[in-house]
Structures are given as structure tokens and as C-alpha cells.
């Protein structure tokens, strides 16, 4: 039973092309490509907005109060 070989996938592809036709498959491919492009553009816009928000917070002149600690490396002699 194992995995499908390349011949199985080619037969499935031919059957799908016969059932739906190449024009319908082309339209589905274009719609899917447009959706992926829209998603990527949306993610890019969200990242740009997050970066701008972070830069605005940093340049706001805020000071963080805290305690600095030295990192001491211990060596075994």
C-alpha cells in the first residue's frame, strides 16, 4: 500500500483535467495566486506598521529604570 508513485499522481492529474477542464483549473490557479499575493502584501503592511510603532515608542524619549548586572564568567582552575 505505501506511498503513491509519480504514475499515480499523473493519472490523478489527467482525471482532474478531464473533469474540470484546463480553463477552470487556470482560473482556480489565478485566484489562488492572487490570494497568496494579497496575504503576503497584508503581512508586509502589518510588519511595517509594527516596526513604525516600535520606532515611535523608542524615539519617544522614554527611560527604562533598572539595574545593570555584570556577567561574571567563572573559570575552574
Curated annotation (Swiss-Prot):
GO terms for biological process, alphabetical: protein transport by the Tat complex
Keyword Cytoplasm: no
Membrane topology reported for the UniProt record: Single-pass membrane protein
Record InterPro entries: TatA/B/E, TatA/E
GO cellular component, as recorded: TAT protein transport complex
Alphabetized UniProt keyword annotations: Cell inner membrane, Cell membrane, Membrane, Protein transport, Translocation, Transmembrane, Transmembrane helix, Transport
Cell location: Cell inner membrane
Database matches in Pfam families: TatA_B_E
Transmembrane segments: 1-21
Keyword Cell inner membrane: yes
Gene Ontology terms, MF aspect: protein transmembrane transporter activity
Skewed-composition ranges (Polar residues): 53-62
Bias type Basic and acidic residues, positions: 66-77
Highest taxon of the lineage: Bacteria
Classification via NCBIfam families: PRK02958.1, tatAE
Subunit structure: The Tat system comprises two distinct complexes: a TatABC complex, containing multiple copies of TatA, TatB and TatC subunits, and a separate TatA complex, containing only TatA subunits. Substrates initially bind to the TatABC complex, which probably triggers association of the separate TatA complex to form the active translocon.
Protein function: Part of the twin-arginine translocation (Tat) system that transports large folded proteins containing a characteristic twin-arginine motif in their signal peptide across membranes. TatA could form the protein-conducting channel of the Tat system.
Family note: Belongs to the TatA/E family.
Protein name as annotated: Sec-independent protein translocase protein TatA
Species whose genome carries this gene: Azoarcus sp. (strain BH72)
Amino acid at each position: 500500500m505505501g506511498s503513491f508513485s509519480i504514475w499515480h499522481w499523473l493519472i490523478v492529474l489527467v482525471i482532474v483535467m478531464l473533469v474540470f477542464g484546463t480553463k477552470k483549473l487556470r482560473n482556480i490557479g489565478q485566484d489562488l495566486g492572487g490570494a497568496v499575493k494579497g496575504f503576503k502584501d497584508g503581512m508586509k503592511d502589518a510588519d511595517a506598521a509594527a516596526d513604525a510603532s516600535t520606532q515611535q515608542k523608542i524615539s519617544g524619549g522614554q527611560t527604562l529604570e533598572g539595574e545593570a548586572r555584570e556577567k561574571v564568567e567563572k573559570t575552574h582552575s
